[in-house]
């Protein structure tokens, strides 16, 4: 097995239920489930989960399942968040109920409806915070918001991740 698959998952206060080909993680931030591939065994003992397989063909998949399970456990206990910044004159974000309203230089504001299980907040007019238990969905929502106006390389205007570094280009010289 891979090094990732051999590493045990510390559950902490998370309750992990394995029933047939379905794994459910329940914690303070919510509940997540995963359809487990047949042939991969998940053993839960003393607050630690380990994975094993008999099939040589499933060895690479075991590491992937372990990483997804680890993210599920972290998500339902701590949660995940992604921070976005709006750079540009007149670029603003505001919450209208549960919907996010973005003014990004278009002729109309963009209204983004958050999917189930995702919380979007705006600490300031130029910051957006996407939070949730499912790492994949949090990243997907943040990418969709960023796609409305990607940062451009000349002035750096647009929606960017807070930790993203935009490589700048020099303007054309006459």
UniProtKB/Swiss-Prot annotation:
Protein name stated in the entry: Large ribosomal subunit protein uL6
Role: This protein binds to the 23S rRNA, and is important in its secondary structure. It is located near the subunit interface in the base of the L7/L12 stalk, and near the tRNA binding site of the peptidyltransferase center.
Biological process (GO), any one: cytoplasmic translation
Top-level taxonomy: Bacteria, Pseudomonadati, Pseudomonadota, Gammaproteobacteria, Lysobacterales
Stated family: Belongs to the universal ribosomal protein uL6 family.
PANTHER family: 60S/50S RIBOSOMAL PROTEIN L6/L9 (PTHR11655), LARGE RIBOSOMAL SUBUNIT PROTEIN UL6M (PTHR11655:SF14)
Gene Ontology terms, MF aspect: rRNA binding; structural constituent of ribosome
Annotated source species: Stenotrophomonas maltophilia (strain R551-3)
Name of the coding gene: rplF
Record bears the keyword Ribosomal protein: yes
The protein's assembly and partners: Part of the 50S ribosomal subunit.
HAMAP family from the UniProt entry: Ribosomal_uL6_B
One cellular component (GO) term of this entry: cytosolic large ribosomal subunit
Keywords: Ribonucleoprotein, Ribosomal protein, RNA-binding, rRNA-binding
